[in-house]
From Swiss-Prot:
Residues where N-acetylalanine is found: 2
Name of the gene encoding the protein in the UniProt record: PFN1
PTM comment: Phosphorylation at Ser-138 reduces its affinity for G-actin and blocks its interaction with HTT, reducing its ability to inhibit androgen receptor (AR) and HTT aggregation.
Stated role: Binds to actin and affects the structure of the cytoskeleton. At high concentrations, profilin prevents the polymerization of actin, whereas it enhances it at low concentrations. By binding to PIP2, it inhibits the formation of IP3 and DG. Inhibits androgen receptor (AR) and HTT aggregation and binding of G-actin is essential for its inhibition of AR.
In-chain residues carrying the UniProt-annotated modification N6-acetyllysine: 108
Name of the protein in its database record: Profilin-1
A molecular function GO annotation: actin binding
Subunit structure of this chain's protein: Found in a complex with XPO6, Ran, ACTB and PFN1. Interacts with ACTB. Interacts with VASP. Interacts with HTT. Interacts with SH3BGRL. Occurs in many kinds of cells as a complex with monomeric actin in a 1:1 ratio. Interacts with ACTMAP.
The organism's taxonomic lineage, starting at the top: Eukaryota, Metazoa, Chordata, Craniata, Vertebrata
Natural source organism: Bos taurus (Bovine)
Top-rank taxon: Eukaryota
Record-listed cross-link Glycyl lysine isopeptide (Lys-Gly) (interchain with G-Cter in SUMO2), residues: 54
Keyword tags: Acetylation, Actin-binding, Cytoplasm, Cytoskeleton, Isopeptide bond, Phosphoprotein, Ubl conjugation
Pfam families associated with the record: Profilin
Amino acid sequence: MAGWNAYIDNLMADGTCQDAAIVGYKDSPSVWAAVPGKTFVNITPAEVGILVGKDRSSFFVNGLTLGGQKCSVIRDSLLQDGEFTMDLRTKSTGGAPTFNITVTMTAKTLVLLMGKEGVHGGMINKKCYEMASHLRRSQY
């Protein structure tokens, strides 16, 4: 799905994000486009299944993983009409910095963004939501 790389380029253009991905979640979940060599390119079908699954209760206790990166769930509105967003933060290992992540959902895709160190989660959320809104208008 090479055409999706332009969406990744657009999401990364202003320099506030360190990672981005477009993931198809219907039928056979897979990464359609992502920043090469970063975390989201490694997202597994099992991780996608957990993200879009009906069981939302364990997120806040256990967190979840994206591309093998452990994350804490801050706010889960992914399955709520009109919102379709989930805000997360990476878990620190060995005192490393943590980063804000937003996941937004469309009819066929998940849009994922990870901000750079010090970038406010609200900025990432807004950018991710706007891309998802564009994809929804384009029937994705």
